[in-house]
UniProtKB/Swiss-Prot annotation:
NADP(+) binds at residue 34. It catalyses: (S)-2,3,4,5-tetrahydrodipicolinate + NAD(+) + H2O = (2S,4S)-4-hydroxy-2,3,4,5-tetrahydrodipicolinate + NADH + H(+); (S)-2,3,4,5-tetrahydrodipicolinate + NADP(+) + H2O = (2S,4S)-4-hydroxy-2,3,4,5-tetrahydrodipicolinate + NADPH + H(+). It comes from the Bacteria. It comes from Burkholderia lata (strain ATCC 17760 / DSM 23089 / LMG 22485 / NCIMB 9086 / R18194 / 383). One of its GO terms (biological process) is diaminopimelate biosynthetic process. NAD(+) binds at residues 7-12, 33, 96-98, 120-123. (S)-2,3,4,5-tetrahydrodipicolinate binds at residues 154, 163-164. This is 4-hydroxy-tetrahydrodipicolinate reductase. SUPFAM superfamilies: Glyceraldehyde-3-phosphate dehydrogenase-like, C-terminal domain, NAD(P)-binding Rossmann-fold domains. The active site is at 153 (proton donor/acceptor), 157 (proton donor). Belongs to the DapB family. Its EC number is 1.17.1.8.
């Protein structure tokens, strides 16, 4: 499998490069970075103390011409450019970017009619198993329990709530037969009035170097149930992304997520 990494100089990009180098079935063939990155021209393994022979570049077409699959954990505007290049070169995509607009998501979905794409806000195996637990819990706590989702991330995260928190909200809302768009409450301030019992609340914390903590709270009278997932390292995201690459290698065009990759549907 010939793999390229987008955002190669970032925290997640470095973790992905290491995961590819440690996979005997994978070959690192490209490392993309921003056009204004000070690391352009450096070896992709520099941050790991290794030589890979692959230089960081901003030349999309040069990288996509060599790759079978691109792994992309960047930002929406970058990912949209990568989708266009992937369509030109018939390259598959594993996308962990979050913060897309509805229009961008529609473009991503349209692209999946021509190339294989795994798109998931969180590729950790633990998070995706947690989603199944939430579906089960929501069905049994559908009456008399208030549902709140609390997430915490590092100070550099630019979108809120996190994509993972929204995935959890979608899982709970779907299990209850609701649309998250109709019942989500994003933060509270001032005099809000009594809580709507059908709502799903979100609260976001940003600070320090928190990799990612997510708790879904089912608060009833006399008891509360908390289902929590905590990430202590980005390694789990990188390992999940590699599983997604392996999954796509045997598939054609289509839009998939980690539930498909892990056989949880």
């Amino acid at each position: 499998m010939k793999i390229a990494i987008a955002g190669a100089s970032g925290r997640m990009g470095r973790m992905l490069i290491e995961a590819v180098l440690n996979d005997s079935d994978a070959q690192l063939v490209g490392a993309l970075d921003r056009a204004d990155s000070p690391f352009l021209g450096q070896d992709a393994g520099t941050f790991l103390g290794k030589e890979t022979g692959v230089k960081l570049t901003a030349d999309l077409d040069a990288v996509f011409a060599q790759a079978d699959t691109l792994i992309d954990f960047t930002r929406p505007e970058g990912t949209m450019a990568h989708i266009e290049a992937a369509l030109r070169h018939d390259v598959k995509l594993v996308i962990g970017t979050t913060g897309f607009t509805a229009e961008q998501k529609a473009e991503l979905q349209a692209a999946a009619g021509k190339i294989g794409i795994v798109f998931a806000a969180n590729m950790s195996v633990g998070v995706n198993v947690t989603l199944k637990l939430l579906e089960f819990a929501a069905k049994h706590f559908s009456h008399g329990y208030d549902i709140e989702i609390i997430e915490a991330h590092h100070r550099h995260k630019v979108d809120a709530p996190s994509g993972t928190a929204l995935m959890m909200g979608e899982a709970v809302a779907g299990a209850l037969g609701r649309s998250l768009d109709d019942c989500a409450v994003y933060g509270r301030h001032g005099v809000t009035g009594e809580r709507d019992p059908s709502s799903i609340g979100f609260a976001a914390v940003r600070g320090g170097d928190i990799v990612g903590d997510h708790t879904v709270l089912f608060a009833g009278i006399g008891e509360r149930i908390e289902i929590t997932h905590k990430s202590s390292s980005r390694v789990s995201y990188a390992q999940g992304a590699l599983r997604a690459v392996h999954f796509l290698s045997a598939r054609g065009a289509g839009l998939f997520d980690m539930q498909d990759v892990l056989g949880l549907r």
